[in-house]
């Protein structure tokens, strides 16, 4: 890679000491939301479009989402209830699992034939509507959606190109989950709370349970998130500027983070990628026999994924499923929270008033009692209260979300989740960690591969 990139060379030369005043800081205390940008303060918000009105005649809407079976069922039940209450509105759903979903929706956004109401990933606002051309500014629909039910910081994270392009359905972050049934078999009775605990668990698993048992498995993208978590814990600065995606770390610091992940592999803490892929291919961890039977006894996953992983365990291991603690690898609280998903209205929608009414119903109104925590703990205050009153908030998800939100303090930039970086099998993160595991390379050996890939998607490195 060329050494002419000024920001990268600057950080190399200063060792980040002279640059400290220029870098975003995190870790000193938890933040209510750590994906918020300053965008919302750049221009006044659009006012409600007073010309919007609900139709008395028949209206057809379409909606799309991704997820698992339980989410599909919740959405469909909520849509049935909505249509019963609004007898002139028919809602046609389109839904599937995540695999291949972004590619399908990207094509639809480009072609201008996406559904009227879309469940969106936060970074889609930047990837597909950075100029505000794909999604309606929901400030114009505020006659029909009570936008005051969301915290300003969470709303700001969805404010792109001077437009409130979606409302946040939920906020999420990563946390450890452990199968204490297996940990107990290894003679460990408490969840890991430090790096020393992790390394001791790796040794105990290998010695007492055998080479086939591991405290944890992390795929390539999971490893990248944990690496960033580790670096933020140690250095107290965001991985990158949350608005400009200017990287805040030197090559040496990143190589250190990569070596941290390698030390977990070498210490039998996490299963080597060749071992996992040899048995499961690209299959999801919760669907692997190793997870189901307790041979993999831990993960580092989104707080909203708790139920999925617990439900996948066999009857022997299910009782041991435990929400762990965030691990402080340094002097700071590392890790980020982000908008888990949002709800947007496409600009091709012919009935934005009805579309906004549907969003209001699902996330602020009676539909929230049906949706519960299927899309995470609701970010809407009214939606959360409604779901709680209905007893529809999963206790594990709520516990995990509470631990995440009270700990993490760093900000996420919009390029971190670029599909060119995180795609399973083909992304740069995959290439980097495959090279470490398959070829036994050090962090210093692969840091340029990571930085080149980040630069290619728009990072200033």
Describe every region a protein language model picked out:
Residues 41-53, 122-173, 322-329, 395:
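Hinge/lid segment of periplasmic solute-binding proteins
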Residues 73, 81, 134-135, 304-311, ...:
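Mature extracytoplasmic/periplasmic domains
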Residues 80, 84-85, 90-92, 162, ...:
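Extracytoplasmic/periplasmic substrate-recognition and gating elements
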Residues 81-150, 159, 181-193, 289-298, ...:
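Extracytoplasmic "Venus flytrap"/periplasmic binding protein-like
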Residues 108, 115-116, 145-182, 214-215, ...:
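A structural signal for short loop-to-beta-strand junctions that line the ligand-binding cleft
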Residues 161, 165-169, 174, 199-247, ...:
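Extracytoplasmic/periplasmic solute-binding protein
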Residues 202-203, 246-278, 327:
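Glycine-centered hinge/linker elements that transmit conformational signals in sensory
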Residues 398-459:
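C-terminal capping/gating helix-and-loop segments adjacent to ligand/active sites or protein-protein/ligand interfaces
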């Amino acid at each position: 890679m060329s050494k002419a990139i000024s920001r990268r060379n600057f950080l190399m030369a200063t060792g980040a000491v002279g640059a400290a005043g220029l870098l975003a800081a995190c870790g000193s205390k938890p933040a209510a939301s750590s994906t918020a940008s300053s965008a919302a303060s750049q221009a006044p918000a659009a006012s409600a479009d007073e010309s919007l009105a609900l139709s008395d005649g028949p209206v057809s809407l379409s909606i799309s989402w991704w997820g698992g079976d339980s989410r599909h069922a919740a959405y469909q039940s909520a849509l049935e209830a909505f249509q019963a209450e609004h007898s002139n509105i028919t809602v046609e759903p389109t839904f599937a699992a995540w695999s291949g979903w972004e590619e399908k929706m990207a094509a639809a956004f480009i072609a201008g034939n996406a559904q009227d109401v879309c469940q969106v990933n936060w970074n889609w606002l930047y990837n597909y509507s950075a100029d505000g051309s794909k999604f309606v500014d929901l400030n114009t629909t505020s006659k029909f959606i009570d936008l005051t039910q969301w915290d300003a910081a969470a709303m700001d994270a969805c404010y792109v190109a001077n437009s409130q392009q979606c409302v946040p359905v939920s906020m999420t972050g990563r946390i450890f989950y452990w199968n204490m049934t297996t940990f107990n078999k290894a003679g460990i009775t408490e969840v890991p709370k430090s790096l020393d605990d992790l390394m001791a668990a790796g040794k105990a698993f290998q010695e007492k349970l055998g080479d086939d048992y591991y405290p944890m498995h992390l795929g390539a993208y999971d490893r990248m998130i944990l690496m960033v978590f580790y670096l933020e814990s140690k250095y107290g600065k965001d991985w990158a500027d949350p608005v400009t995606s200017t990287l805040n770390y030197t090559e040496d610091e990143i190589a250190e983070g990569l070596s941290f992940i390698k030390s977990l592999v070498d210490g039998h803490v996490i299963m080597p990628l060749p071992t996992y892929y040899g048995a499961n291919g690209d299959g999801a961890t919760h669907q692997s026999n190793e997870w189901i039977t307790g041979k993999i006894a831990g993960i580092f996953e989104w707080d909203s994924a708790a139920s999925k992983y617990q439900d996948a365990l066999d009857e022997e291991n299910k009782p041991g499923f435990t929400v762990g603690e965030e691990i402080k690898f340094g002097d700071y609280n590392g890790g980020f929270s982000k908008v888990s998903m949002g709800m947007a209205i496409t600009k091709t929608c012919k009935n934005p008033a009805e579309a906004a009414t549907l969003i209001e119903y699902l996330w602020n109104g009676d539909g929230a009692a049906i949706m519960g925590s299927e899309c995470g703990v609701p970010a809407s205050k009214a939606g959360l209260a409604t779901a709680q009153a209905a007893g529809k908030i999963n206790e594990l998800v709520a516990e995990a979300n509470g631990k995440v939100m009270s700990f993490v303090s760093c900000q996420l930039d919009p390029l971190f989740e670029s599909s060119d970086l995180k795609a399973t099998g083909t992304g740069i993160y995959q290439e980097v960690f495959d090279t470490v595991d398959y070829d036994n390379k050090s962090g210093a050996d692969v840091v340029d591969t990571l930085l080149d890939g980040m630069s290619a998607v728009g990072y200033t490195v």
